């Protein structure tokens, strides 16, 4: 894009009546970031740090953003974060916009964002060829083939999936790229859906607390986790 990408975006012809067709578009989301900057005088990083990242435990100084030619952070993708960062964000949605007792997102917004607002990818010729791209789209969040399941979906298979009926989240960071486009990440989703079908029905009963097992799991997770690398210039 050029330095005048905002003007070019606004001058792009609209081929369909608004609300009648879905075409994957990242510039539209980046334009929302430009609106935030216009209204607040802050870029996305500086705006979100005290309002979101700090509140849900994301180390904002460790994030890396791709930028537009005018220096604004890309709003439609290009933020490099850890798997745990992604999980924290979608945990906020899974809990209805509340984090440790503090409301961060409105309940109404979360309900709309995580439910079908349009028939996604209505033109298959210009959308990634993956079955889970044709289930529906909320506000920056994709619906999934298993009923009630939704996901955040980044480039090359960065998925954070919410299973509301099971009170469960699953975050994946991978590099599923190739000439087949969306078909590569779709294989990961297909595998997850097969695994989901093999699970017993979710129970509505609360299991008794098992302190010993919980402590064992915490110790195990500490050994599995990798320390977040500090942000630094790219190596040669």
Regions found by a protein language model. Give the residues of each.
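Short, gly/Ser/Thr-rich active-site loops of penicillin-recognizing serine hydrolases
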Residues: 180-236
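Active-site-proximal alpha-helical segments within enzyme catalytic domains
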Residues: 28-35, 75-98, 110, 158-175
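Active-site Gly/Thr loop motif
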Residues: 3, 60-63, 111-171
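Non-transmembrane alpha-helical segments in soluble domains
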Residues: 6, 10, 33-37, 45-49, ...
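Catalytic-site signature segments of enzymes, centered on catalytic residues
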Residues: 1-77
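Active-site-proximal binding-pocket segments
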Residues: 53-115
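Active-site rim elements
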Residues: 18-22, 73-78, 149-156, 176-183
